[in-house]
């Protein structure tokens, strides 16, 4: 998993509440178990017209936001059915951080497992970040995970909280496999000792 320390980039404003996982990645894209290639399906029902062409009104199709690394979204982001394809699609598009006032629990947990930082802020701070994001490529946000702060283009700072364990995993790039491998010496020692005690196993 790619490490997350300090991220600087354009933030796209998605001023919608209750964005569910079917809106993030519709069901027709769930046939694959590959994590790559899902970026094209991200928000596809809003992003594309019926004929498959880009919807110019959708934020991620606008030139200022096509390379966005940060998504500033409305309340209750990631609600709906459980599908890990949702963070996969965001990551494949290039989104490494989502900022909102609240997230659905399963989506929130899945973000951490896939190297995406979900940041919870107050409504007041979200409105400020929406204002920053509205400026597009003329203003970038800096997400400083070690310092637990979001720095705006005009020097404003928004602090955020994060579980220390999840913070360490993101900074060190540790997913579930990486965490298990940290225990590899202890696992190997146990297997050796167990084999000596019970060689018939």
UniProtKB/Swiss-Prot annotation:
SUPFAM superfamilies for the chain: LeuD/IlvD-like (SSF52016)
Catalyzed reaction equations: (2R,3S)-3-isopropylmalate = (2S)-2-isopropylmalate
Assigned keywords, A-Z: Amino-acid biosynthesis, Branched-chain amino acid biosynthesis, Leucine biosynthesis, Lyase
CDD domains in the cross-refs: IPMI_Swivel
Pathway terms, separated by semicolons: Amino-acid biosynthesis; L-leucine biosynthesis; L-leucine from 3-methyl-2-oxobutanoate: step 2/4
Quaternary organization: Heterodimer of LeuC and LeuD.
NCBIfam families associated with the record: leuD, PRK01641.1
Descriptive protein name: 3-isopropylmalate dehydratase small subunit
Organism field: Xanthobacter autotrophicus (strain ATCC BAA-1158 / Py2)
